[in-house]
């Protein structure tokens, strides 16, 4: 029944795309959602004739526990960054979750765990469950909950929390895969956006372990582009390969690697696919 419901919803989203109605996406996250959706996603969609409205509720390093606390208290704790259908960007400071949820008729609302906790499912609950229940009360039932699977750190990262995974990139990646899979099995989440797998796929290519600018945030060019390509492939149910948009400074081979890594992650979100470029 859940699969049928999700299929019907996707048909409605495709109908909105075909009708020229903006697809509205809200991320409740932190700097990792900033890396993924605040650049490139709007442009990738525009290149294929898809209008979008994209919002990001941003607190640096925010875990699910703090999001849930802000939900309970109504804290005006967020920077709300929004990209409208024309690509105009605005930021509203001191925003609450309830106001952001009411700001648009959202199609997708994403949740994610803070990066250092992303492979530790015990830290997800009861906060993930409470947030989903809250969203269901405050937005129309048509809005779909999606979960953003974030990425493992660079192998040589000095980021606090990396010791949770023995300072081992593949151990962290596998833990993230397990935790995100458990979230998908136990909660009414419609879609997984496997940015973590896309980044790990890209690391098998000639990029190597260069996907991060500081050991944990994404490279500003091809790192962020790879994540945005993954969101595009999953949300719009189409390959990103061949999309003509890429940010200035990327070579044709880099564009191909990022697009292939994203498409492979959309097909196989819980396993690494080697990219031979």
Named regions from a protein language model:
Residues 25-29:
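Short, hydrophobic/glycine-enriched beta-strand segments
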Residues 31, 35, 43-48, 112, ...:
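Structured segments of extracytoplasmic/periplasmic soluble domains
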Residues 17-19:
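Boundary at the C-terminal end of the N-terminal hydrophobic targeting segment
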Residues 211, 215-218, 222-224, 228-277:
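Conserved catalytic region of serine esterases and O-acyltransferases that act on ester linkages
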Residues 4-13:
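Sec-dependent N-terminal signal peptides
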Residues 22-24, 53:
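Residues that mark the start of a beta-strand
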Residues 94-220, 233:
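Alpha-helical cap/lid subdomain in secreted, periplasmic
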Residues 35-124, 141:
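Conserved SGNH/GDSL esterase-like catalytic core that processes O-acyl groups on lipids
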